[in-house]
């Protein structure tokens, strides 16, 4: 069994910096679930980030159900049986 410790103050401080950069640049900042998918932290990140970037069906489902904002999904290939569901839950599908 593994355990991870996340510094909430550091996470929020970094997310606020990203929010400031996004506002100044006029762009969106999304959470890459491949790099950080610790969904119990999503509640603190949700107000500061614009959504999530997923790399497949399971990450897109996590983003839609737990983060609840813009879901961008990208993969070099998709399983044919997953495309309909991905199109339904993703705001952008590449």
Predicted features along the sequence, with ranges:
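A non-catalytic, amphipathic alpha-helix used as a structural packing/dimerization or gating element
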Residues: 9-17
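Generic N-terminal amphipathic, Lys/Arg-enriched alpha-helix
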Residues: 1-6
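Active-site-proximal beta-alpha core segment in soluble small-molecule metabolic enzymes
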Residues: 27-94
């Amino acid at each position: 069994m593994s355990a991870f410790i996340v510094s909430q103050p550091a996470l929020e401080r970094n997310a606020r910096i990203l929010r400031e950069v996004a506002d100044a640049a006029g762009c969106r900042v999304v959470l890459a679930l491949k790099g950080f998918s610790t969904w119990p932290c999503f509640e603190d990140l949700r107000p500061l980030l614009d959504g999530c970037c997923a790399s497949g069906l399971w990450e897109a489902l996590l983003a839609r159900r737990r983060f609840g904002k813009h879901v961008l999904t990208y993969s070099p290939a998709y399983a044919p049986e997953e495309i309909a569901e991905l199109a339904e839950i993703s705001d952008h599908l590449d």
